[in-house]
């Protein structure tokens, strides 16, 4: 057994692991990266964020072709199978792997591909694919192993018609009807994707509102859009059992209802990847969902062991995970890069997409903050009209007296890009965070960013 010594060992090469490894390496530390796959990138690159967003992009292109009258001159609407669309989308994975492999090489981070587990608080043993065991001894270890879909024991996920958000990418046909159980972010995103391919979708939600953490107006807009696009949303429903058939699946609900479809996609929660880490050897406990607890420095109860990304729970976003990993390493190397990551914009890649940052109306009302609202509807924006994307709006919440921007909520074309302008202003100190910025700034024309000026004028016109 070979023994290697490092300053920092990172478990997991997803966004959190990458952020941690790069920060530690750039601070001059000797760093090793361990990943259970034979390629870097983690679940984000291989099964999650990257393939699903690339898939969404391909579906949007198909939808634009099929709904734009201009293209009828060259033929009728085209329908593509799910495997064909996925094959096109998967091309980006190899490009991402190549880019990320280059990052590690340039920063002299040693890569170990195999199953890593704790032997003790400073030692990780890696069982490689060829059976060779490597021992890595480190001053500090960062757990960034991510998460996987939660699988209830009473559901047969080996059945060929039952999928989760990892295995759905192996779907070999296009179902006519699909049940999606779980209307969280992942469930809503896949509902949009399959609906865009002409699939009838039954979206089962165990709550009374879609994505209830969003501003209620944005949530309602998504619900309305779903209802117009072959997506039936069933609220306040819980599964009783799932019955797999030769030609489909029947979902039995506790309300007594039964839904039959060609396939079922389970999107109800995620579990931290900690069960194979030998956590009992270091005294770090995990909760019922396999997640570990950390402090604001991303340190566990063991002083030299840290955690970042999905494995620590909220907010379980790739963007936040990268910054959490970077901050965990910042706590170790003490180079001024640490920050507690809590100002994360929400990006939801439904069709149309959603993004927000800051407070929503419910939160401000509950806190008795005197706020006002400014809105810009995309149907009136020149750039949205040119792009043929009239659905959506930008909504700015601001303080009536100080004009401080308190929240930005966007639904529609390029929402995940648009939100960053508001985020930048909200992060300005003191009086520099003001709605007046949008009125006194010249925006390129025509752009979607111009919606900020329109919304600002709308909000100011409401004041008296």
UniProtKB/Swiss-Prot annotation:
GO terms for biological process: 2-oxoglutarate metabolic process; NADP metabolic process. Keywords: Cytoplasm, FAD, Flavoprotein, NAD, NADP, Oxidoreductase. It catalyses: NAD(+) + NADPH = NADH + NADP(+). It is found in: Cytoplasm. Its EC number is 1.6.1.1. Binds 1 FAD per subunit. Pfam families: Pyr_redox_2, Pyr_redox_dim. One of its GO terms (cellular component) is cytosol. GO terms for molecular function: dihydrolipoyl dehydrogenase (NADH) activity; flavin adenine dinucleotide binding; NAD(P)+ transhydrogenase (Si-specific) activity. It comes from the Bacteria. Its cofactor is FAD. FAD binds at residues 35-44. It is an enzyme of class 1 (oxidoreductase). Homooligomer; probably composed of four stacked rings of 7 or 8 monomers. Forms filamentous structures. NCBIfam families: PRK05249.1. Conversion of NADPH, generated by peripheral catabolic pathways, to NADH, which can enter the respiratory chain for energy generation. Belongs to the class-I pyridine nucleotide-disulfide oxidoreductase family. PANTHER family: DISULFIDE OXIDOREDUCTASE, SOLUBLE PYRIDINE NUCLEOTIDE TRANSHYDROGENASE. This is Soluble pyridine nucleotide transhydrogenase. It comes from Pseudomonas fluorescens.
